[in-house]
Amino acid sequence: MDRRTKIVCTLGPAVASADGILRLVEDGMDVARLNFSHGDHPDHEQNYKWVREAAEKTGRAVGILADLQGPKIRLGRFTDGATVWENGETIRITVDDVEGTHDRVSTTYKNLAKDAKPGDRLLVDDGKVGLVCVSVEGNDVICEVVEGGPVSNNKGVSLPGMDISVPALSEKDIRDLRFALKLGVDFIALSFVRSPADAELVHKIMDEEGRRVPVIAKLEKPEAVTSLEPIVLAFDAVMVARGDLGVEVPLEEVPLVQKRAIQIARENAKPVIVATQMLDSMIENSRPTRAEASDVANAVLDGADAVMLSGETSVGKDPHNVVRTMSRIVRFAETDGRVPDLTHIPRTKRGVISYSARDIAERLNARALVAFTTSGDTAKRVARLHSHLPLLVFTPNEAVRSELALTWGATTFLCPPVSDTDDMMREVDRALLAMPEYNKGDMMVVVAGSPPGVTGNTNMIHVHLLGDDTRIAKL
């Protein structure tokens, strides 16, 4: 059986060519991430075109995710591009626009001198370098280096515990969001989500642009952890972005936040991505550490829909080897491991139908579960149950097919609109009997809505034998 957990790859200089992206798709990339913290609009547009071309050449559904920078606080630029801060040194972080030196560098957060107070921590580059505020002098925050290390242009700064006042969407984010929607991306990821209301800000701009796509909440702030379930309900999917999360909340809490987020997302049929430093050592090395292999496998066994690669594919030495390695780890975890069953009891019609379809298919030892969907909702409700049976999803909507590239286990087929159950079964026969792994007489359990084409109308389970016009059950 094909790998069920999806792989998200961040695009960047290491794969910035038509051939590089085609090879990523062939290696196993399911979703391409355009990181708007780096690159410019022409770069992202070119990568977008290459992904669409690669998907067409391979016949695979490949989603494209635009990841907005969000109100990320960063250092400015250094005259020499980089420097190394040693323990005990005094560094001035200024809100003035200056060319950075070893001792003084600017920040993008213009209220820092107002908000900072002695004792506050400033963590640079996902916490690799640590500073403590000693005093504030005018526009400069005077800091002592308590954890030294290299720093370079535009590195991120986290301010754990500091009450900061930044909007959910910066002016840059709004420009990038409008550009990404016009470009045609399949998902928008919103960084540093703090409240369920943040989703409404994105939806407002989407409505102005006349195009709605799924919005992914990146869980990186303590406020998001506190409001985890309301945020999951307000957004279409979630990403456990462990880099910033691990410096904003105590490091030891991150594994349990990951497990809680996955559990809540599964209960609500929302796709969930686990991200950051999954195979980080492979940016430089040809093999991952044992801890990294365990990390990927545990994300799979927690029930994640997707695992994400960042610098490993965007700037790594051998991005193709990284994707193949991750795919092997995932496959082995899926083959010999087991995802815990959902303890959540469904109380909606669609939820109960999806549970029942899974149970019927497994009890009858069917060859596969088949879902017909116009919105993707039916497929997501079946996928969250993590059946050992293949999940084959038919949709007449190209955008939904791309969206389901992020959903666990979903193998998608684009089909013409169907008008009744007989049409559905003909489409199933046409597609599956052309595949070597399926034969006439194979049993399929089909879950769909009747009449077809009505969003949110999942109300039918149908047991079908491939190539057989006689329906043996309709429940």
From Swiss-Prot:
Q: Which key words tag this protein in UniProt?
A: ATP-binding, Glycolysis, Kinase, Magnesium, Metal-binding, Nucleotide-binding, Potassium, Pyruvate, Transferase
* Protein known as: Pyruvate kinase
Listed under subunit, the entry gives: Homotetramer.
Q: Which cofactor does it need?
A: Mg(2+); K(+)
Q: Which Gene3D superfamilies match?
A: Phosphoenolpyruvate-binding domains, PK beta-barrel domain-like, Pyruvate kinase, C-terminal domain
Q: Which gene encodes it?
A: pyk
**Leader peptide range in chain numbering:** none
Asked whether the keyword rRNA processing is assigned, the reply is: no
Q: Which domain of life is it from?
A: Bacteria
Residue numbers for the site described as Transition state stabilizer? 218
